[in-house]
Amino acid sequence: MPRAVAGPEIERLIQLIARLPGLGPRSARRVALHLIKKREALMAPLAAAMTDALGKIVECRRCGNVDVCDPCTICTDTSRDRRTLVVVADVGDLWALERAGVLNAPYHVLGGVLSPLDGVGPEDLNLAKLVTRVHEDEVGEVILALGATVDGQTTAHYITDLLREAHVRVTRLAQGVPVGGELDYLDEGTLSAAIRARTQM
Amino acid sequence: MEWTDEGIVLGVRRHGEGNAIVELLTRLRGRHLGMVRGGASRRQAPLLQPGNTVSATWRARLDEHMGNYALEPAVVRTEVLMRAPHAAFGFTHMAQMLHLLPERDPHEGLFLTLGAILDAFEDRESAGRLLARFELALLAELGFGLELETCAATGSRENLVYVSPKSGRAVCGEAGAPYADRLFALPRFLVEGTAPPAGDVEDALRLTGHFLLTRVLEPRGLGLSDARAAFVSAWRRSTAPV
C-alpha cells in the first residue's frame, strides 16, 4: 500500500478520478495535479459545470436519451423525420450516429441489449415504450442500430418479433467490411456477413 | 497449472476496461471461466462471440484460481447466430440452460451435442428437433433422464406412444389408452432417430419443456426462458405452410 502523499481531500479526488474510464491510479494523479495547478482556470469551472449538470441532467421519458430537459432536444426537434425511428442500445450509440450526421430521425434508447447470462432480460430494457411509440407516432420504419454482436442481433430479432403486429418496416444496419478494412485482416464472421450482404455494382 | 482444450463460448463479461471474463463449455473440463487479457478490445471482439468454438489454453498458479485464457478460433459461427432468429434464440436458451451446470464438472456428451447442434442450426426445419434432443441430453446429464425405451406399465418395447408426466417413462398404447388425455405423446423420432414431421417436434418440445420446468427450473425458482418461447415462435413461423 503506497503512502499517501497529500491530504485526504486530494487523495479522495485522485481515487475518484481513477474510477473514470481510461484512467488508472497513475494517470489519475497526473490529472489531479493538472487540476490543482490550474485551480482557477480549470478546476473551478469544471466543478461548477459538473454541479450544474448534476442538478439538471434528466432521462427523457419519451426516448431514454439524457439531456437537461424532458422531452429531450432531439424529441422536440420538429425538423426530424417522424416516420422513422432509430433504436440504439445506449446513449453513446446515439451520440455516435449524431456525429456521423447521416440520419435525421428521432431515437429510442434501449438502455442495453439482451444478455440472459448477465441477467439482462426484456423487462430490463426500454421496450414497452418503444412499442407504444411505434403505434402512437405512426412510425413507418424502425431502424435497429444495434451492435454486430450475437447479443445485439438477438435483441434485434426480439424487437422484430415485438413489432410484428405493428406492421412497420423493420430494418437493421448492414454488416461487413469496415471503411479502410483490408480483407486479409478481417475475421471469418465479418467476411461471411460481407459476402452474404454483397451488392450489385 | 496449464491445460489446452476445445471450448464453446457461452458468454463474455467485460472485466475492467480492457479485459473480459469468458465462460466456455470445454470438452473435458465442463463449464469453465477464465480471464482474457485484452478481451474487450476490438481485435478480440469477433472471436469472443457466443457460439464460437475456440482452442483454449488456460493458465493459473493454482487450480482454484480463475486463471487466464489464451484463445484461438476453431469454428466461427457468429454470422449464422446473428442472421437467423431461431438460431440466436435457440443458442441463448441453450447457454442459459448450460449455466445451470456446476462449474468445472465435465460433460463431454453435452459439449459434443452442443457443437453438433450449432453446426446444423442454420437449417430451420431441423432446429426444433435438435433443440428437443439437446434438452433431452441436458435432462439426462442433470440426472433427470427420461426412460423412453420400455413401457413403464408392461415392460414392452413395442408401440410406445405416450410418456408419463410424473415418472418420465414411456407408456405403450394399450396401457396408456385409458389415461391418454393426461399423458404426453411420445414422438417416434426421439426413440428411432427418424426425420420427424413438424407435429412430432411440437410434441417433443412440449415434453422436454415440461420436464425441464418441473424437474430442473421450478426447484430453483426459475421458469422457462423468454429465449425458448422466442425460439419456438421463430421455428413455428419458419415451418408454417406459406
UniProtKB/Swiss-Prot annotation, chain A:
Disulfide bonds: none annotated. The keyword Ligase does not apply. SUPFAM superfamilies: Recombination protein RecR. Residues 83-178 form the Toprim domain. Keywords: DNA damage, DNA recombination, DNA repair, Metal-binding, Zinc, Zinc-finger. GO terms for molecular function: DNA binding; zinc ion binding. It holds the Pfam family RecR_HhH. InterPro entries: DNA_Rcmb_RecR, Rcmb_RecR, Rcmb_RecR_Znf, TOPRIM_dom, TOPRIM_RecR. A zinc finger (C4-type) spans 60-75. The keyword DNA damage applies. GO terms for biological process: DNA recombination; DNA repair. NCBIfam families: recR. Belongs to the RecR family. May play a role in DNA repair. It seems to be involved in an RecBC-independent recombinational process of DNA repair. It may act with RecF and RecO. This is Recombination protein RecR. The gene is recR.
